[in-house]
């Protein structure tokens, strides 16, 4: 099974038909997008999922990352995070646990959702090595590939694979230096392993073998961003660009083998560099779907990073990013709660919509809201709101004497005043 090969043969699959219906585009548009590597549709032969297209000409999608840590590991809490992410309207999930029984947690998360689920196999491989052998640097390459295959068989739909970290990337990082160091967990694991063992990254060195696993299990490959900046002052540096170029070359190779591929982008980017990052990524990857991690546009707002990321995500989407990884208010501070997961998804959905208003001219809901407000039709306003429940709760908690309006204006509602004298 290969959606790319099917599309290139001219076949419109059921998955492509569903995406076309969801997005309001033609089936041929989706087929051509998949055939050209500009659209991916994560699937799995091992579980039925809610079909979701990601890529050029489609609505910007939002991913919610969940998972335990070595300090907090409660699978029931993670399942509640799944529920909250779904309630908030996430398009996909990533299960990124690093504490507890990792395989069992992932199994339970996958069983609890119909959304496409992504993972980072490298985490489990390194953590198992630490538990069984004493250190993450004692991981065996064979174990990394074994775990990758096991996660694929468990029904994982897409995987972040850190292929772009190699000796050349590390040389760029060493020569340039950084203000905030290396903040990607996968990047840190792999860099430490390479330096300790004096070996090339097996995901890069044995990329052909990795592709065989991806092809066999129809997993969508997400080219991981292990060299992403962890501070705006490190944004768009030589190490990040080197990794992007390597990932772009490998993404082309994956596509030629029939493996659907996404390329991940940076996480901390000042506003004036966002457009350049999107243009560069789209150009060097031949317009493959772009997965932005946030991005955060300033580093001084811990506790409010979901709002900071809204700014970056809205701009990224407007310039052409296809996929946004949410950020919660707990970013840089703690493992998020289910409530913070909900807030993070809502924030990212708002940002994605703002971007799509520009990128795809998707403004019908905003037009409907304008009409509903003019008519003082509160039920219509709630229906079109991105979070109807919250909008209704706020108004209901402070109901006006005149139930047509709200307590913001009371008797002096501009809409009601004008309506008495002017019909337009």
UniProtKB/Swiss-Prot annotation:
<dbReference type="InterPro" id="IPR038521">
    <property type="entry name" value="ThiC/Bza_core_dom"/>
</dbReference>
<feature type="binding site">
    <location>
        <position position="264"/>
    </location>
    <ligand>
        <name>substrate</name>
    </ligand>
</feature>
<feature type="binding site">
    <location>
        <position position="162"/>
    </location>
    <ligand>
        <name>substrate</name>
    </ligand>
</feature>
<comment type="function">
    <text>Catalyzes the synthesis of the hydroxymethylpyrimidine phosphate (HMP-P) moiety of thiamine from aminoimidazole ribotide (AIR) in a radical S-adenosyl-L-methionine (SAM)-dependent reaction.</text>
</comment>
<protein>
    <recommendedName>
        <fullName>Phosphomethylpyrimidine synthase</fullName>
        <ecNumber>4.1.99.17</ecNumber>
    </recommendedName>
</protein>
<feature type="binding site">
    <location>
        <position position="409"/>
    </location>
    <ligand>
        <name>[4Fe-4S] cluster</name>
    </ligand>
</feature>
<feature type="binding site">
    <location>
        <begin position="225"/>
        <end position="228"/>
    </location>
    <ligand>
        <name>substrate</name>
    </ligand>
</feature>
<feature type="binding site">
    <location>
        <position position="406"/>
    </location>
    <ligand>
        <name>[4Fe-4S] cluster</name>
    </ligand>
</feature>
<keyword id="KW-0411">Iron-sulfur</keyword>
<dbReference type="InterPro" id="IPR037509">
    <property type="entry name" value="ThiC"/>
</dbReference>
<comment type="pathway">
    <text>Cofactor biosynthesis; thiamine diphosphate biosynthesis.</text>
</comment>
<dbReference type="Pfam" id="PF01964">
    <property type="entry name" value="ThiC_Rad_SAM"/>
</dbReference>
<feature type="binding site">
    <location>
        <position position="268"/>
    </location>
    <ligand>
        <name>Zn(2+)</name>
    </ligand>
</feature>
<dbReference type="GO" id="GO:0016830">
    <property type="term" value="F:carbon-carbon lyase activity"/>
</dbReference>
<dbReference type="GO" id="GO:0008270">
    <property type="term" value="F:zinc ion binding"/>
</dbReference>
<dbReference type="GO" id="GO:0051539">
    <property type="term" value="F:4 iron, 4 sulfur cluster binding"/>
</dbReference>
<feature type="binding site">
    <location>
        <position position="123"/>
    </location>
    <ligand>
        <name>substrate</name>
    </ligand>
</feature>
<feature type="binding site">
    <location>
        <position position="291"/>
    </location>
    <ligand>
        <name>substrate</name>
    </ligand>
</feature>
<dbReference type="InterPro" id="IPR002817">
    <property type="entry name" value="ThiC/BzaA/B"/>
</dbReference>
<keyword id="KW-0456">Lyase</keyword>
<feature type="binding site">
    <location>
        <position position="413"/>
    </location>
    <ligand>
        <name>[4Fe-4S] cluster</name>
    </ligand>
</feature>
<feature type="binding site">
    <location>
        <position position="94"/>
    </location>
    <ligand>
        <name>substrate</name>
    </ligand>
</feature>
<feature type="binding site">
    <location>
        <position position="332"/>
    </location>
    <ligand>
        <name>Zn(2+)</name>
    </ligand>
</feature>
<keyword id="KW-0479">Metal-binding</keyword>
<keyword id="KW-0784">Thiamine biosynthesis</keyword>
<keyword id="KW-0949">S-adenosyl-L-methionine</keyword>
<dbReference type="GO" id="GO:0009228">
    <property type="term" value="P:thiamine biosynthetic process"/>
</dbReference>
<keyword id="KW-0408">Iron</keyword>
<keyword id="KW-0004">4Fe-4S</keyword>
<dbReference type="GO" id="GO:0009229">
    <property type="term" value="P:thiamine diphosphate biosynthetic process"/>
</dbReference>
<keyword id="KW-0862">Zinc</keyword>
<comment type="similarity">
    <text>Belongs to the ThiC family.</text>
</comment>
<feature type="binding site">
    <location>
        <begin position="184"/>
        <end position="186"/>
    </location>
    <ligand>
        <name>substrate</name>
    </ligand>
</feature>
């Amino acid at each position: 099974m290969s959606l790319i090969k099917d599309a290139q043969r001219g076949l419109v699959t059921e998955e492509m038909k569903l995406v076309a219906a969801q997005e309001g585009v033609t089936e041929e548009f989706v087929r051509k997008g998949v055939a050209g590597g500009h659209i991916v549709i994560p699937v799995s032969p091992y579980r039925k999922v809610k079909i979701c297209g990601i890529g050029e000409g489609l609505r910007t999608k939002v991913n919610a990352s969940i998972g335990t840590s070595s300090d907090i590991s409660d699978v029931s809490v993670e399942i509640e995070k799944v529920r909250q992410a779904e309630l908030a309207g996430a398009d996909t999930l990533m299960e990124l646990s690093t504490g507890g029984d990792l395989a069992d947690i992932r199994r339970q998360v996958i069983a609890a959702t119909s959304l496409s689920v992504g993972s980072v196999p490298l985490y489990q491989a390194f953590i198992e090595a630490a538990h069984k052998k004493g250190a993450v640097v004692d991981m065996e390459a064979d174990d990394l590939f074994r775990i990758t295959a096991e996660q694929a068989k468990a029904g994982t739909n897409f995987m972040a694979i850190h292929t772009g970290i190699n000796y050349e990337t590390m040389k760029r990082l060493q020569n340039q230096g950084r203000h905030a160091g290396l903040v990607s967990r996968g990047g840190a694991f792999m860099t430490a392993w390479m330096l300790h063992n004096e070996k090339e990254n097996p995901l890069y060195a044995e990329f052909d073998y990795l592709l065989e696993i991806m092809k066999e299990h129809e997993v969508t490959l997400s080219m991981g961003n292990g060299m992403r900046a962890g501070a705006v002052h490190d944004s768009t540096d030589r190490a990040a660009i080197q990794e992007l170029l390597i990932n772009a070359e490998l993404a082309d190779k994956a596509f030629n083998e029939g493996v659907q591929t996404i390329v991940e982008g940076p996480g901390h980017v000042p506003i004036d560099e966002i457009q350049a990052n999107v243009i560069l990524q789209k150009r060097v990857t031949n317009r493959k779907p772009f997965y932005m991690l946030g991005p955060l546009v300033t580093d001084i707002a811990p506790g409010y990073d979901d709002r900071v990321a809204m700014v970056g995500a809205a701009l990224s989407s407007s310039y052409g990013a296809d996929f946004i990884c949410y950020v919660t208010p707990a970013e840089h501070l703690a493992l998020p709660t289910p409530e913070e997961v909900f807030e993070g998804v809502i924030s990212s959905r708002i940002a994605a919509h703002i971007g799509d208003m520009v990128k795809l001219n998707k403004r019908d809901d905003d037009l409907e809201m304008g009409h509903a407000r003019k008519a003082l039709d509160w039920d219509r306003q709630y229906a079109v709101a991105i979070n109807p429940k919250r909008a209704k709760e706020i108004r209901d908690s402070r109901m006006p004497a005149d139930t047509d309006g709200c307590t913001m204006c009371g008797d002096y509602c501009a809409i009601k005043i004008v309506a008495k004298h002017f019909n337009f």
